[in-house]
Amino acid sequence: LNSTVVNVRNRDDGLVDASYVVAGNAQTVRAKRCILAGYGGMVPHLCPELPPAQKESLAYGVKVPFICTNVLLRSGAAIRKAGVSSYQCPGSFYSLVATAPPVSQGNFQPPTKVDDPLVMWMIHAAAPPASGDQSSRDLYRLGRHQLLSMSFEDIEAATLSQLSGMFGATGFNAETDVEAITANRWAHGYAYEYMELHDPVWPEGEAPHELGRAPIGRISIANSDTEAHAYVQSAIDAAIRAVNEIL
């Protein structure tokens, strides 16, 4: 834990070496088998012995970049007065704006009064408008560059501007209502999922994620990228497959 893997390789004696860095020190652990679970695009760099065609397959999917922002409001009166809990905002910086789901745990109950605090949850999909010549993978790469070039001040300004535009008429005041903003930048966010508009339809077993996840020696490859699906159930499916490969 808290270590960064930098190399995984099959040894001539049938074992596997995994090299990693922890607390500034390089270490190597030796094992009978290994599951390499991580961002598919990084796997070829961590395991250079992969054949070129498999490296190309692993590099096909491009992670979807996001900014997930939480805004804590001292008073949620202006939002509650609007009477809507979720907004789709095409063309705006945040395409989705919603009140965070209320959480009840033990003796804790969420605020319910009109003037009680409220958390807003906002999603920015960092991809520029398509020119017509770009694939979704091209747009995700451009969006990642855009996302990483933004400062917190840029994100803060866009956040306050959109909230003011949406809820100013119901009394929202950015100067007095906002207690805190937390912006989570996911430069490499969701696993790539194929789109009929941009991707071919491959025969079963020949899609890039299927070719890319083939075991090499005693190393198996997992992560949701190997399922071409971004959610936890896919990561679990990948883990089960990889474990079965090494048993």
Model-derived features: where do they sit?
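Short beta-strand to alpha-helix junction loop
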Residues: 1-3, 150-151
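Mid-domain catalytic core of redox enzymes
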Residues: 2-132
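Conserved flavin/dinucleotide-binding core of flavoenzymes
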Residues: 72, 78-247
